[in-house]
């Protein structure tokens, strides 16, 4: 079973969490534009900074998810006598949105799990509608054996011949009559140890919750023959139906949940003064080290300036006609992304690539690897190599000197993940030396907060080691005092960049 699960990790990943909470489906999939455009606001910003009232799912996706649930619930086999018609619930949608924004590949929050059911799905790569995940959840039926009444003495057995069946049982749990879902774009989401650059994360919450131990998901019998009295005998397409229950409530533009509403009021009514600004000296930096490129972009075209050593490649570059010259060492006129596929750094789904310029090489050897035929060249030309972008969690005290000090011609640091509350770390053990360019004796994460690359709640940071500077300037930014340093005897320097 473990081998089977590993085989499907990149196609469909399932996670079962105890306490009878349904699990997750993760179909792997690139070319996100179609889906992602729907989850951007009018200014082209992702919904991570939503205006008040902006919903975390489109009306079309909401209706498609709801319709598919009711269709699947109406056609279960054996037939259900008490399957209830499902409706959309705005409060469940809001709770799903809140959890989706956390970008955590696990069920939650813990405070809600005793009272709701939850199915999760994620993918990155080519466009997949949310209903793709719903259908995948239902398709677990092939591994589920329905427990007939004569088998329940008094508890019904749970028989599942596959990795997990609890997505399916939640979808068809007869009394789970309300659903609310949300979609969020999660950058660099950790899916069972793999970092997905742009994960489209679907969270669906159900109420009343299903998957109660010892119970069948529904009663077997003639459709609608065992509906609760509250339905008044109503039946629609094999589902217990109450007139008017298909109407769902759409929040007005100015409405939001109670917590968000209180926060917005506080924010909106506070009048900021000049002294407020000077006391905090807030600085925000959105400059990125990485660059988004197409399959055809050559390093010779793109490598301009210092921040030209990390790239994000799209999916589908195997189908591109862009040429690649060389093997291991690639000529500067080579496609960055296709060279990365050839070397095995990424596959056709795209991903992150680090590039190191290597100077002139006398010749370049052709080869065929990973579906890409490269060209040979026997003339001297500038070259580059490619390497994998790794991700590493660090502490508030970790320095670049410890992690990845500068070495000529260039050094690559892993993408680091900073924990929360580094502002509160002891400044004697987590020093910040410099402004914008920092001594590599500095704490990476506190320097990132000082530079405005991340806030005190932590997050991902790109680090670029550079050669030492003669002078580092002190400043007070974002609640952190940095130190000055002149003519340091040793050590190098670094810059920090946002990951967005």
UniProtKB/Swiss-Prot annotation:
Which cellular compartments is it found in? Answer: Secreted
How is this protein named in the record? Cysteine-rich secretory protein LCCL domain-containing 1
Q: Single GO cellular component annotation?
A: extracellular region
Gene name, per UniProt, is Crispld1
The organism named in the record is Mus musculus
Disulfide bond found in the keyword field: yes
Domain of life, source organism? Eukaryota
List, in alphabetical order, the GO biological process terms annotated in this UniProt record: face morphogenesis; hematopoietic stem cell homeostasis
PANTHER family, per the entry: CYSTEINE RICH SECRETORY PROTEIN LCCL DOMAIN CONTAINING 2, LCCL DOMAIN PROTEIN (AFU_ORTHOLOGUE AFUA_5G08630)
Secreted as UniProt keyword = yes
Give the family this protein belongs to, as stated in its UniProt record: Belongs to the CRISP family.
């Amino acid at each position: 079973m473990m081998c089977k699960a590993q085989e499907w990790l990149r196609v469909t990943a399932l996670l079962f969490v105890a306490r009878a909470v349904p699990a997750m489906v993760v179909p792997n999939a690139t070319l996100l534009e179609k889906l992602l455009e729907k989850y951007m606001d009018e200014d082209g910003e992702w919904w991570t900074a939503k205006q008040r009232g902006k919903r975390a799912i489109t009306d079309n996706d909401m209706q498609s998810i709801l319709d598919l649930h009711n269709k699947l619930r109406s056609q279960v086999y054996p037939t259900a006598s008490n399957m209830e018609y499902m409706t959309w619930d705005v409060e469940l949608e809001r709770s799903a949105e809140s959890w989706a924004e956390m970008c955590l590949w696990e069920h939650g929050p813990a405070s809600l799990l005793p009272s709701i059911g939850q199915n999760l799905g994620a993918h990155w790569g080519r466009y997949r509608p949310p209903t793709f995940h719903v259908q995948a959840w239902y398709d677990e039926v092939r591994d589920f054996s329905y427990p007939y009444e004569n088998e329940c003495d008094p508890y019904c057995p749970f028989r599942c011949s596959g990795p997990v069946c609890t997505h399916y049982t939640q979808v068809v749990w007869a009394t789970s009559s309300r659903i609310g879902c949300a979609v969020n774009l999660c950058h660099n989401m950790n899916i069972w140890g793999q970092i997905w650059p742009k994960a489209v994360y679907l969270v669906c919450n159900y109420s009343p919750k299903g998957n109660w131990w010892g119970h069948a998901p529904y009663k077997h019998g003639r459709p609608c023959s065992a509906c609760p009295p509250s339905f008044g005998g109503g039946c629609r397409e094999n589902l217990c139906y109450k007139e008017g229950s298909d109407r769902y409530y759409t929040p007005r533009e100015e409405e939001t949940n109670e917590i968000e509403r209180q926060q917005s009021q506080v924010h909106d009514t506070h009048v900021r003064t000049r002294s407020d600004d000077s006391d905090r000296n807030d600085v925000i930096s959105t400059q990125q080290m990485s660059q988004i490129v197409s399959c055809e972009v050559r390093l010779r075209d793109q490598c301009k300036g210092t921040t030209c050593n990390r790239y994000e490649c799209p999916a589908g570059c195997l189908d591109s006609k862009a040429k690649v010259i060389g093997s291991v060492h690639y000529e500067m006129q080579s496609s960055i992304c296709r060279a990365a596929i050839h070397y095995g750094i990424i596959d056709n789904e795209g991903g992150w690539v680090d590039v190191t310029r290597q100077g002139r090489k006398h010749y370049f050897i052709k080869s065929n690897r990973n579906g890409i035929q490269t060209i040979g060249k026997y003339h001297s030309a500038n070259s580059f190599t490619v390497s994998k972008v790794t991700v590493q969690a660090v502490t508030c005290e970790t320095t670049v000197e410890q992690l990845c000090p500068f070495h000529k011609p260039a050094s690559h640091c892993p993408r680091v993940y900073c924990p929360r509350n580094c502002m509160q770390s002891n400044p004697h053990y987590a020093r910040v030396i410099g402004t914008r360019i920092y001594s590599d004796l500095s704490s990476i994460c506190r320097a990132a907060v000082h530079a405005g690359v991340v806030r005190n709640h932590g997050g991902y940071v790109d680090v670029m080691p550079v050669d030492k500077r003669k002078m580092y300037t002190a400043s007070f930014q974002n609640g952190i005092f940095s130190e000055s340093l002149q003519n340091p005897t040793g050590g190098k320097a670094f810059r920090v960049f946002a990951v967005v």
